[in-house]
A protein has these predicted regions:
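Short beta-strand element of the alpha/beta-hydrolase
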Residues: 58-66
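N-terminal cap/lid segment of alpha/beta-hydrolase-fold proteins
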Residues: 25-53
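Short beta-strand/loop motif that positions the catalytic acidic residue
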Residues: 181, 187-189
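The serine-hydrolase catalytic nucleophile loop
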Residues: 67-79, 199
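Catalytic histidine neighborhood in serine/cysteine hydrolases
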Residues: 207-223
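Alpha/beta-hydrolase active-site loop
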Residues: 73, 106-128
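Primarily recognizes the serine-hydrolase "nucleophile elbow" in alpha/beta-hydrolase
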Residues: 123-182
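Conserved alpha/beta-hydrolase
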Residues: 81-102
């Protein structure tokens, strides 16, 4: 049985009452129904995030953003997952401070250390009662998610990467790290995003089963793949992977 590491998690705004699971009328890119929080990375940096989905639930997903973006790029997908019963945490990496609904994390930008931000996000969800977890990352967020998964072992049930590079500004995953990722792995990239497509091949060859490579006909990168010409296929692949390896507990009504 897992023993979650408890860290303080500070609510900033009262959660908006949820209607019909997560509010079917809520725009997918909206923060309505979400809760703004702060939490700490595993090396003590205070980060800004948002919780989407139901107040309770054992299945959780951490969404990690790419470099030229922030947590708001995930809001539409976070809402969709929340409506399916997942507890979803988006967050800004250290030093990323877009402001407004997108939040503002403390610290300086330090890309080689951001895997510790992902670890902190995992602890934040665990402190809320989540016991089955997936890490989903775009570009550098995917690289950081693989590193975190290699360290957290069986605490992570699935990892999904969108256009993740093997290395970026001092953040990197080599064969020795990839070999430690026991979670079910889904690697997605576009064939016109050449470096990302090559990375999928490398990741697939250096990791254990279960794993799946998906190369699509597109030049979109990271979270842009969820709004581009292959958006439907990308989201379907991701949701199917989550449903298979991080299923939401279904309530069974009695006779």
């Amino acid at each position: 049985m897992r023993t979650p590491i408890r860290r303080s998690i500070v609510p900033i705004l009262a959660i908006v009452a949820l209607v019909s699971a997560c509010g079917a009328d809520t725009p997918l890119g909206s923060t309505e129904g979400s809760k703004e929080i702060t939490f700490e990375s595993t090396d003590g940096v205070t980060l800004s995030g948002r919780l989407f989905g139901p107040d309770e639930g054992s299945a959780g997903v951490v969404l990690a953003h790419m470099f030229a973006s922030d947590q708001s790029a995930w809001y539409f997908f976070a809402n969709r997952l929340g409506e399916q019963g997942y507890r979803v945490l988006t967050f800004d990496f250290r030093g990323f401070c877009p402001g407004g609904d997108a939040g503002c994390s403390e610290g300086e930008k330090n890309i080689p250390a951001i895997w510790q931000d992902v670890e902190g996000a995992v602890e934040a969800l665990q402190s809320q009662g989540t016991t089955r977890l997936a890490l989903v990352g775009a570009s550098m967020g995917g690289t950081a998610s693989l590193i975190a998964a290699s360290r957290l072992g069986k605490d992570i049930d699935a990892v999904i990467t969108l256009s993740a590079p093997p290395s970026f500004q001092g953040l990197g995953v080599g064969p020795e790290v990839l070999a430690e990722v026991t979670a079910a792995k889904l690697f997605i990239a576009g064939n016109e995003d050449t470096d990302a497509a090559l990375a999928v091949d490398a990741f697939f060859g250096q990791t254990l089963q279960p794993k799946r490579p998906v190369i699509l006909t597109t030049g979109d990168h990271g979270t842009d793949m969820l709004t581009g010409n292959q958006a439907g296929i990308v989201s379907t692949e991701m949701i199917n992977w989550l449903e298979r390896y991080v299923p939401v507990a279904k309530l069974v009504s009695g006779a």
